[in-house]
Amino acid sequence: VIAAGAALPFIGRPTRAATTPGRLVFGLSSYPPSLAPWANTGTAAATARLMFHRGLLGYAEDGSVRGELAERWERADDGAWVFHLREAFFHNGKKVTAEDVAWCIEQIAAEKSTAYLRAQLQDIAKVEIPDAKTIRLHTKDPSVTLPLNLASFYAPIIAKDSFKESPHGIGAGPFMLTAEERGVALDFTAFDKFYRPGLPRLKTLRLIAYADENLRVAALQAGDVDLIEYVPWQSMTSIEADANLTMQSTPGPFMYLTFNGRVKPFDDPRVRRAVAHAVKREDVIKAAFFGRGTPIGGLPIAAGTPYYDARFADSLGYDPAKAKALLAEAGVGTGFSCKLLSTAQYGMHKDTAAVVQQHLAAVGMGVELVLPDWPTRVTLGNRGQFELAVMGSSADSNDPDGLTPFIASNVTASYVRSTGISTPDIDRLLAAGRTEFEPAKRRVIYDELQQKCNEQAPIVALCFRAQAYAMAKRVQGFKNLPGALTFYSGTTIEQTST
């Protein structure tokens, strides 16, 4: 199948379909498992939500934090974060008010909430509403990272009590959701009261799911879609060579392994470290990403960024002899069997799993692959129904605190992280980094964090990967955001034209 997909550019593709001015058809990698506003159900769902939901803050195309529903914000003398709302409207015609914002924060942080950012927003101790366009957030401790959490696409602002009108809530994004063809496509029309004058540039938008990555590429080449996400790595070279297409690629997302600490022997950090030392990252990059990646032997902190430290960068790198020694020390030196959860829907996940299976076998671990479709993989992960799992994602921001969802143990259960592993030292250091405003002191904290993570191995990072969008040459304005923010690129559809 891969060979056929790779050959498509050279075998007389169909004539490109005619384009309707003001309309964009976007090929997603999956139909969103859920459009619940505050849940993490994958990149396709996040992209779809960015069409009709927006938060207080978001990201500009250069990766900087920008205002969305808040036109400006500052930290007050008493330590509170103050947000000043712009004139904005929800899709039901009601004005966005501070009361809506307060209600959303309460819903996300509620004790029984399943929101992805519940733990982070529980740091907000008090919410004040001086007037309809101002909201003051007092945190339990000083927080340098609260604006980053509020820029997340997991923290959109919806109209108060609007679940009565829509299961997804009523948002204030650039497009209104007008039709859902379950498992197939989502249709949107431009919202004429969007808060940015002159935007969106498109009149209509269709997000259509192509779970088969080769069919997704073929649809772009044939002109059936104008833009695709998750360009498969085996197709990147041919797309770059196609005069009708443009590809935008950035490093940032990473592949990693998660563990179920309730299942022996993965409760033992020595076994988790052994798994790390057993896997040759270069083989993952070659098999899954056609060489378009960079090995990670510690935490996924990119070289050249302020908090990267070479001393910790390869502490968990490939060393099969050390892996065997650690397994023996943990009392499982004679080997054991386990199941590795991945998915057949994304080639990168499946291929990564195959390489991991091969390398773990070399140190005595018999691994059976479990390869359901993506929605099932998400459900199993959220329920903690796995032993060992392959995952690919991106940090929530380019700040080290953006790794909190992957390595903290005091956050809401999610398919993106390990389960049943308690790491209080890591949780303490993450909290300390959040409350420190001095960069030099934050660096000391994150150095210690890297050391503790290399000892406890709450996850095992494998490699950074190139992440690309591809589009017809006529598509203008779309931007692939840098580094960890690549999955926020859907934000720029508001400025995209055809």
Enumerate the predicted regions with their spans:
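Gly/Pro-rich hinge or "lid" segments in bacterial periplasmic/extracellular proteins
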Residues: S64, L148-R206, D212-N214, A321, ...
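Alpha-helical secondary-structure segments
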Residues: A98-E106, A132-H138, G173-P174, R201-T204, ...
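Structural transition elements
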Residues: P295-E329, Y346-H349
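Ligand-site clamp/hinge motif
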Residues: K193-S238, Q358, G366-E368
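N-terminal lobe/hinge region of extracytoplasmic solute-binding protein
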Residues: G27-D77, E106, H168-G171
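Surface-exposed binding/hinge segments that line
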Residues: E74, L117-A159
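Extracytoplasmic/peripheral linker and loop segments enriched in polar/acidic and small residues
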Residues: A362, E368-R377, T404-K473, S497-T498
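Long beta-strand-rich cores associated with HINT superfamily self-processing modules
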Residues: Y469-T498
